[in-house]
Regions:
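Juxtamembrane regions of bacterial inner-membrane/periplasmic proteins
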Residues: 2-151
C-alpha cells in the first residue's frame, strides 16, 4: 500500500475515533452505575422544582452536545438550565448510595447518568423527583450569602 493511502486510512481512523469517543465514554459511564434511579410517583407539574422556569422546549442532553459545550464560548457563559441541574442532583444522589469509586469514574458515571436521565425522563418527572428529594432547599442554602459555601 502506498504511503498516501496509509495516511488517509490513519486520518479516517483518527476522525472516527474522535467522533465515537463521547458515545463510548457515555456507555462506559453507564456500565459503572449499578441500576438506574426511578422517577418520583407524583402528579407531573411541568414547573421547575427550584424556580418558576417553564419546562417547555427543553432538548435532552447527549454526549456529543455535552462535549461541544466546552468548545463554544457563548454556551459556556450561559446559565445551565434548571432541568439539567436537577438531573445532575438526582444522578449524584443515586451514585452516593452506591459503593465509592475513584474520582475519574465518579465524574464519568455522574455525567453519563445525568445525560441518561434527561433522555429517559420527562422534564416533569425530573422536577417532581427533585422536589421529592428536597434539592431546592439544599441548593438555596448554598446560594445564601454567608451560607455553607462561604469560606
Amino acid at each position: 500500500m502506498r504511503a498516501a493511502g496509509k495516511a488517509w486510512i490513519s486520518v479516517v481512523v483518527l476522525v472516527a475515533g474522535i467522533v465515537l469517543l463521547p458515545g463510548l465514554l457515555y456507555l462506559l459511564g453507564l456500565t459503572l452505575v449499578e441500576g438506574r434511579p426511578q422517577p418520583a410517583d407524583r402528579v407531573p407539574s411541568g414547573v421547575a422544582a427550584c424556580t418558576s422556569e417553564p419546562r417547555t422546549g427543553y432538548q435532552p442532553m447527549n454526549p456529543w452536545h455535552f462535549i461541544a459545550r466546552f468548545f463554544d464560548k457563548d454556551v459556556m457563559k450561559k446559565k445551565v438550565p434548571e432541568v439539567e441541574r436537577e438531573a445532575f442532583w438526582i444522578a449524584r444522589r443515586h451514585l452516593w448510595r452506591q459503593p465509592q469509586q475513584d474520582m475519574l469514574r465518579w465524574h464519568l458515571s455522574s455525567t453519563a447518568l445525568t445525560i441518561w436521565i434527561t433522555q429517559h425522563w420527562s422534564t416533569a418527572q425530573i422536577a417532581d423527583t427533585a422536589r421529592k428529594e428536597d434539592f431546592c432547599r439544599a441548593w438555596s442554602k448554598r446560594r445564601v450569602p454567608g451560607g455553607p459555601m462561604r469560606k
